[in-house]
């Protein structure tokens, strides 16, 4: 982690790295000063998200909310889970990095719910049941 002399400004050659998680997805987000481009696992973010506008917008939502869309470049490494779980993990990582960048963003991001980690995960299957909660059919006679 870089110790910045002025916590509200990021040096041109430095970056902030934060982690976000959702279900089984883990995303590591690097935030650089730039022009709004983002890459995911070495591929353009738009290409990685298969041109799906709602997923692309969801990734950039914390930046849109703070009106910083064209201020930062993002390098994202994500693994595990499906696309939606990965998007939510990335979104949490971006929000955490923005808080590290400037503490004044923390309250507005927290009120909007960007800093809340969603704890819901798949429930494990129990023995004697067909799925996590589905029981075999019961017959009285």
Swiss-Prot record:
InterPro entries cross-referenced by the UniProt entry: Ribosomal_Su5_D2-typ_SF, Ribosomal_uS9, Ribosomal_uS9_bac/plastid, Ribosomal_uS9_CS, Ribsml_uS5_D2-typ_fold_subgr
Task: Quote the subcellular location field of this record.
Answer: Plastid, Chloroplast
**Paired cysteines (S-S):** none
Q: Which GO terms describe its molecular function?
A: RNA binding; structural constituent of ribosome
NCBIfam families per the UniProt record, alphabetical: PRK00132.1
Instruction: Give the main localization category.
Output: plastid
Organism the protein comes from? Tupiella akineta
Q: Which GO terms describe its cellular component?
A: chloroplast; small ribosomal subunit
This chain's protein is named Small ribosomal subunit protein uS9c
């Amino acid at each position: 982690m870089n110790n910045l002399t002025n916590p509200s400004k990021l040096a041109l050659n430095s970056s902030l790295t934060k982690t976000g998680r959702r279900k089984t997805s883990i995303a590591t987000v690097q935030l650089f000063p730039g022009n709004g481009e983002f890459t995911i696992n070495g591929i353009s973010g738009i290409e990685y998200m298969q041109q799906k506008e709602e997923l692309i917008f969801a990734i950039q939502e914390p930046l849109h909310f703070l009106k910083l869309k064209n201020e930062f470049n993002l390098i994202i490494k994500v693994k595990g889970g499906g696309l939606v779980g990965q998007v939510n993990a990335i979104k949490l990582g971006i929000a955490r990095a923005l808080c590290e960048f400037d503490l004044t963003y923390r309250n507005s991001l927290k009120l909007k719910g960007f800093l809340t980690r969603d704890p819901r995960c798949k429930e494990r299957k129990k023995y004697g049941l067909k799925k996590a909660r589905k029981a075999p059919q019961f017959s009285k006679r």
